């Protein structure tokens, strides 16, 4: 793994404060995180890098960065997190103020 891990991506520092990476699909694939964007709770997204392009996308001035998803997509991301990384789903629900669903 020669790409920048999403846990180490902290830019753009003027806007973003990483709280937790909730889903990391690995090299060359996507990662989702929860954090504070301009003092609002948001879901961030990025493409992890590869050996040939370790920074991934998006990037700015040679630094790996996060981009924010439309809030309308938060529930869809939560559904993916619940399937792929269930331990992080309740953290994400609590952080975003979404109701915790009871197990059947």
Which ranges hold each PLM region?
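Short linear sequence motifs
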Residues: 9, 25, 38-40, 59, ...
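Small/flexible residues
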Residues: 15, 19, 43-44, 48, ...
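Negatively charged, low-complexity tracts enriched in Asp/Glu with abundant Ser/Thr
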Residues: 1-27
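Mixed-charge, Lys/Arg-enriched low-complexity segments
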Residues: 49-104
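A short, structured beta-strand/loop element
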Residues: 28-61
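Alpha-helical interaction segments
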Residues: 5-6, 37, 56, 85
């Amino acid at each position: 793994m020669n790409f920048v891990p999403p846990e180490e991506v902290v830019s753009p520092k003027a806007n973003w404060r990483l709280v937790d990476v909730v889903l990391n699909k690995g090299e060359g694939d996507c990662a989702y995180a929860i954090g504070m964007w301009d003092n609002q709770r948001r879901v961030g997204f990025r493409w992890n890098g590869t050996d040939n392009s370790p920074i991934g996308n998006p990037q700015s001035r040679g630094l790996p960065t996060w981009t924010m998803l439309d809030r309308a997509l938060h529930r869809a991301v939560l559904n993916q997190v619940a399937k792929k990384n269930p331990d992080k789903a309740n953290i994400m629900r609590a952080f975003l103020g979404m109701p915790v669903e009871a197990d059947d």
